[in-house]
C-alpha cells in the first residue's frame, strides 16, 4: 500500500477544502461501483484510492463534473407525456 499525504494531494488541488470535496465525490463513485479506479486498487478503501488518484494528478473537478452529467431529457419527456394523458 502506497502512503498518501495531504501535501502530495495539495500539489494538484488548490486548498484542503477542495481536496475534501473532490476526494469525497470520487470515493463515492468508486464505492458505488459506478466508476473504475485510475490506479491499482491494492486492497485499499475507496477513500484511499481516491486520494492516490489525486496525488498522482489523475483526478480533477473537470473529470468529476463530466462523469456526473446525465442525459435526462428522455426521462422528462416520458413524464410529460404521462401527465398530459392524465389531464
From Swiss-Prot:
SMART domains: RNA_pol_Rpb6. GO terms for biological process: DNA-templated transcription. Pfam families: RNA_pol_Rpb6. It catalyses: RNA(n) + a ribonucleoside 5'-triphosphate = RNA(n+1) + diphosphate. Its EC number is 2.7.7.6. Gene3D superfamilies: 3.90.940.10. One of its GO terms (molecular function) is DNA-directed RNA polymerase activity. GO terms for cellular component: DNA-directed RNA polymerase complex. SUPFAM superfamilies: RPB6/omega subunit-like (SSF63562). Keywords: DNA-directed RNA polymerase, Nucleotidyltransferase, Transcription, Transferase. InterPro entries: DNA-dir_RNA_pol_omega (IPR003716), Pol_omega/Rpo6/RPB6 (IPR006110), RPB6/omega-like_sf (IPR036161). Promotes RNA polymerase assembly. Latches the N- and C-terminal regions of the beta' subunit thereby facilitating its interaction with the beta and alpha subunits. The RNAP catalytic core consists of 2 alpha, 1 beta, 1 beta' and 1 omega subunit. When a sigma factor is associated with the core the holoenzyme is formed, which can initiate transcription. Belongs to the RNA polymerase subunit omega family. This is DNA-directed RNA polymerase subunit omega. It comes from Pseudomonas fluorescens (strain SBW25). The lineage of its organism: Bacteria, Pseudomonadati, Pseudomonadota, Gammaproteobacteria, Pseudomonadales. The gene is rpoZ.
